[in-house]
From Swiss-Prot:
This is Transcription termination/antitermination protein NusG. Keywords: Transcription, Transcription antitermination, Transcription regulation, Transcription termination. PROSITE patterns: NUSG. Residues 133-161 form the KOW domain. The gene is nusG. GO terms for cellular component: cytosol.
Amino acid sequence: MTEETTVSKKRWYVLQAFSGFESRVALTLREYIKQQQMEDQFGEVLVPTEEVVENVAGKRRKSERKFFPGYVLVEMEMNDETWHLVKSVPRVMGFIGGTPDKPAPISKREADTILNRLEQNTDKPRHRNEYHPGEEVRVTEGPFADFNGTVEEVDYEKGRLKVSVSMFGRATPVELEFGQVEKIH
């Protein structure tokens, strides 16, 4: 069998895992694959995440957020052996799609969409606190601390906002960093 034939048989499947255990399920599955020497029947095992930046107490903090909490993506050839291997992993509830005995892969388009989203997120992290023009914010740091204002423009590349702060009865446009404001709930 040629390498091309082997690769073309692999499709992406979605596993449902206990929420909060996605990474452990992915790690355990990779270990099982290696122990059973079935690497040729499996491709990637992914927990789709994106890096988000949030401001906590005025400091920027990066963290990871799962796209699909409770799910793990597996690229694999579907047969009795691989099915049983995956089902034997602790905290795996089953496959999504198809029937319990004959799971259905996700479409190539769906897989490509997810993989492209993962690739885009390695370039630049998203901000957990997304701001939108017209939104009310409170300035927490700097000379305008404790003033309220309205978001006029948002620049995610630079992590800055243009906020119209009301001072002395006039709206004054001020450029601030994300860490200098908080949303008014």
